[in-house]
């Protein structure tokens, strides 16, 4: 099964960006400049992470 990776249409072709794929109900996340490292999560956990990022929960990491 070939994985269909997607990235934002706002990303530049040469830019480093996140790519997402859906496989068997899970979400895969990787960086385009390091495609060998893949994070597997669930849609629910990804939504919770994105909401936390939007709400500033991780601002102290940057």
Named regions from a protein language model:
Residues 1-62:
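Positively charged, low-complexity terminal tracts
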């Amino acid at each position: 099964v070939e994985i269909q990776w997607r990235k934002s249409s706002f990303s530049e072709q040469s830019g480093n960006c996140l790519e997402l794929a859906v496989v068997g109900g899970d979400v895969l996340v990787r960086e385009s400049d390091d495609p060998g490292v893949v994070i597997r999560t669930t849609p629910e956990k990804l939504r919770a992470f994105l909401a936390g990022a939007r709400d500033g929960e991780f601002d102290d990491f940057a």
